[in-house]
């Protein structure tokens, strides 16, 4: 066993007892020293994944490659173990980086793709997770863990049919596995809901019936099954299922409205009226209609904030009775509250087509576009609203707010905003518009007050949270800007633009370790892994020399003749206490690609650090012969002479 193999086994043992910090330190030292790289045979050994909860000391057959031409052996499994250790530490972006490197080095090993997919899934990047896990299953079809995780990745990517097929195939191999069966039933449920929404009511009925028979029971399965029966006009069966749903949630009044609607469909008006009276709704028999009752169910769900059920009920109404302004407005509101902006806009537009002069769809559309900050579209919507006869003051209000967010001169917009404020307007939309206008005028101190007013009304207002960042940066208040960036990204973690701004801020304020972490997080969401030199530089500036050296080595594999990368790698090795290794690497690179004054100077420094005083003197003299007057070389040479004389 080589010393490298012994060190790897030591790291594996540390990982097996959850001493991940020690395992990472050992593995990063090996990777930084180049032990993970080298010439490896394409059919080199593989590490086989044995499940997501596999212990470190299982399945650890080594995948190092032996250099048949006398080159140093490579141990790419170092990257795999690093990926697993960082995943265990919940540092998923770094886990992705190392798993990516390993999978490129050993592409036939399903374990690498498995752990890459697992870390992508932890970062909520379902598409990348699916691609990695599909490759894992292809390389190792017998892997139960990879198949289960692939099914989950498909589910999270909103592809229930693909998920169900994966679980079905896995169950054919492992029919008694409870995890696979649970995944299969979950994916079948989501697929059944999709079939119902697309109009395949009979297929949905069969699927929901199967699920209930498999003990996947409760309000949701019964409610969806009832909707399926209703779409098929099987009203008695639908009534039975609505009552079954109510039995699971007896205090949910919305479910009673469905029962009443079915009683009306079946001609039982007296029973429907009696049921409604228990809900506090007094209505004559001849005034009861199924339309009224389904609409009532939609409204009840909305009152309770049950947006998914409200959307389902509204969809049922639309399929049964066709479109109307009222139902499209309700559906738009449901989808707007659920964050599905484009679907909401579609329903507002459909309502406008039914009644072009009805102002309510125009107001709803303007609110939706404003919340989504789609200002160019809002400007056009305002003109349409004016043409439909909407209130002139309301249109003026939206026009001024929109102007503040477009490329209009802020000094021209400000008087209109001030007029609105004097007129009694006191809402967060106006406050934010005043904030952005003052920022553009260079009056961040005034802007700050308006954003703070907004946040008193709504602490979750995203525009105001971003506005505070801009104000603090303009006022050079780095401490508050730093805090606000952190607060914002903890709430809206997917905003890549703000994260890039935060990285620039962290670099400017020399918070290098945190800058590197955020660079890594951004890189995990893009094909290509590391952000190259920027990440390596941040790690180096943070004093994280092992991690920086690993990245510089990866970059040098792509650009082996680039001097800056070489010099930075050697610098990191020196800081790690591996000046000897750095010196050997530098000399080898100079022999291969030629030397330079800077390289010779660094060689002189390394000779001094390794106590090769005579070699340092020769090297530094050569530098001064090539470039007389080089101050750094002169100072180092004087130091070398002093060391030589002290030894004499």
Swiss-Prot record:
Q: Pfam families from the xrefs? A: TPR_6
Does Lipoprotein appear among the keywords?
no
Name the UniProt key words of this record, in alphabetical order.
Repeat, TPR repeat
Cysteine disulfide links = none
Protein name as annotated: TPR repeat-containing protein TP_0095
The record's listing under SMART domains reads:
TPR
**Taxonomy of the source species:** Bacteria, Pseudomonadati, Spirochaetota, Spirochaetia, Spirochaetales
TPR repeats: which residues? Answer: 1-30, 76-109, 110-143, 144-177, 219-252, 325-358, 428-461, 527-562, 597-630
């Amino acid at each position: 066993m080589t010393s490298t193999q012994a060190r790897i086994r030591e790291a594996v043992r540390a990982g097996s007892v959850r001493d991940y910090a020690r395992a990472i330190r050992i593995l990063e030292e090996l990777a930084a020293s180049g032990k993970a790289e080298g010439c490896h045979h394409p059919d080199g050994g593989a590490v086989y994944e044995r499940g997501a909860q596999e212990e470190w000391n299982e399945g650890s057959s080594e995948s190092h490659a032996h250099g048949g031409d006398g080159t140093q052996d490579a141990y790419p499994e170092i990257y795999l173990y690093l990926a697993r250790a960082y995943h265990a530490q919940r540092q998923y972006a770094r886990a992705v980086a190392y798993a990516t490197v390993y999978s490129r080095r050993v592409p036939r090993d399903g374990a690498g793709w498995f752990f890459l997919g697992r870390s992508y899934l932890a970062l909520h990047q379902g598409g990348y997770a699916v691609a990695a896990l599909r490759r894992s299953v292809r390389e190792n079809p017998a892997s139960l863990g990879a198949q289960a995780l692939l099914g989950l990745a498909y589910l999270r990517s909103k592809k229930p049919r693909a998920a169900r097929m994966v679980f079905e195939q896995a169950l054919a191999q492992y029919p008694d596995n409870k995890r696979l069966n649970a995944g299969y039933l979950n994916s079948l449920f989501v697929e059944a809901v999709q079939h119902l929404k697309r109009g395949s009511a009979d297929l949905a009925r069969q699927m929901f019936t199967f699920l209930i028979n498999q003990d996947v029971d409760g309000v949701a399965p019964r409610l969806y099954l009832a909707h399926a029966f209703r779409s098929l006009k099987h009203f008695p069966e639908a009534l039975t299922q609505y009552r079954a749903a109510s039995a699971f949630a007896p205090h949910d009044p919305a479910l009673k409205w469905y029962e009443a609607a079915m009683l009306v469909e079946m001609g039982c008006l007296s029973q429907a009226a009696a049921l409604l009276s228990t809900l506090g709704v007094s209505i004559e028999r001849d005034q009861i209609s199924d339309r009224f009752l389904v609409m009532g169910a939609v409204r009840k769900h909305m009152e309770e904030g049950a947006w998914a059920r409200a959307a389902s009920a509204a969809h049922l109404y639309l399929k049964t009775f066709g479109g109307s302004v009222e139902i499209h407005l309700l559906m738009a509101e449901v989808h707007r509250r659920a964050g599905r902006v484009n679907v909401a806009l579609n329903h507002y537009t459909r309502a406008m087509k039914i009644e072009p002069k009805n102002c309510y769809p125009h107001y709803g559309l303007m609110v939706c576009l404003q919340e989504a900050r789609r200002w160019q579209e809002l400007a056009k919507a305002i003109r349409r609203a004016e043409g439909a006869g909407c209130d002139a003051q309301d249109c003026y209000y939206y026009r001024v707010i929109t102007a503040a967010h477009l490329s209009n001169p802020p000094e021209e917009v400000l008087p209109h905003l001030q007029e609105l404020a004097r007129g009694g307007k006191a809402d967060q939309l106006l406050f934010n518009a005043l904030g952005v206008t003052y920022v553009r005028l260079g009056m961040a101190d005034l802007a700050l007050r308006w954003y703070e007013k907004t946040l008193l009304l709504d602490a979750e207002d995203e525009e105001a949270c971003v506005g505070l960042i801009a104000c603090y940066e303009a006022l050079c208040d780095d401490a508050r800007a730093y805090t606000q960036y952190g607060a914002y990204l903890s709430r809206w973690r997917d905003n890549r633009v703000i994260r890039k701004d935060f990285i620039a801020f962290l670099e400017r304020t020399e918070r290098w370790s945190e800058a590197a972490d955020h660079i890594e997080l951004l890189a995990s969401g893009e094909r290509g892994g590391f952000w190259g030199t920027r990440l390596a530089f941040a790690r180096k500036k943070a004093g994280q020399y092992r991690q920086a050296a690993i990245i510089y080595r990866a970059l040098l594999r792509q650009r082996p003749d680039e001097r800056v990368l070489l010099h930075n790698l050697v610098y990191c090795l020196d800081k790690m206490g591996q000046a000897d290794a750095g010196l050997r690497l530098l000399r080898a690179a100079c022999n291969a690609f030629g030397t330079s004054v800077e390289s010779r100077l660094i060689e002189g420094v390394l000779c001094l650090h390794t106590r090769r005083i005579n070699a340092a003197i020769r090297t530094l003299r050569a530098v001064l012969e090539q470039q007389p007057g080089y101050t750094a070389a002169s100072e180092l040479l004087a130091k070398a002479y002093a060391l030589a004389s002290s030894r004499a």
